[in-house]
A protein has these predicted regions:
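Cyclophilin-like peptidyl-prolyl cis-trans isomerases
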Residues: 17-189
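Bacterial N-terminal signal peptides
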Residues: 7-15
């Protein structure tokens, strides 16, 4: 009887192991179909839509380059609206370079589970530039993004730039590794 029970349990484990894994609620989030191309923009090409990133150090406001990176902006705005970033860590902080977040695992290897095709553009990396982090391949961006702490011309044309910090750069400069995003939301101008 013990052998049959063990065989039965092993069989159940094998069958269960072969089924599709269930994603956590954060992994299962998929962006809404926001038409970023239709967002109104100012003379600098930045959207009127403002993302408010609240940290323990204060608030950061970001506007998006919705015409240059419509699919990437649509995805990030969708994730923001669903609360994906709330409570996540800034898992990568390199002084005089970047701060990075957007990984639910906090390791730099996680994301929302849906990769994006690159939308490289001619916007330069200046202080406060917001761009999507990626792996080795150009089409490997997901939910992780970074904010440039200085001008980074060697990154120009190699990463999808999605926005610019328009208020709170002094807050960005205070972020340290493992600081938490209190909340990330969208507000209208």
């Amino acid at each position: 009887v013990r052998i049959h029970l063990t065989t039965f349990l092993l069989g159940i484990a094998l069958i269960t192991g072969c089924t599709k894994t269930i994603q956590s609620p954060r992994e299962a989030l998929i962006e809404d179909d926001f038409a970023a191309k239709t967002f109104k923009t100012d003379k600098e090409g930045l959207s009127h839509l403002i993302a408010l990133l609240k940290t323990v150090h204060g608030n950061i406001e970001i506007k998006f380059y919705s015409k240059e990176s419509p699919n990437s902006v649509s995805k990030i705005v969708g994730l923001i609206k669903k609360g994906f970033y709330d409570g996540l860590k800034f898992h990568r902080v390199i002084p005089n370079f970047i701060i990075q977040t957007g990984d639910p695992t906090g390791t730099g290897r996680g994301g929302s589970g849906k990769l994006l095709k690159a939308e490289f553009n001619s916007i330069p990396h200046i202080k406060g530039t917001v761009a999507l982090a990626r792996g080795e391949g150009p089409d490997s961006s997901d939910s992780q993004f970074y904010i440039a702490l200085t001008t980074l011309p060697h990154l120009d044309g190699k990463y999808t730039i999605i926005g610019q910090v328009v208020k709170g750069m002094e807050v960005v400069d205070k972020i340290t590794k493992n600081d938490i995003i209190v909340s990330f939301s969208i507000k209208k101008k």
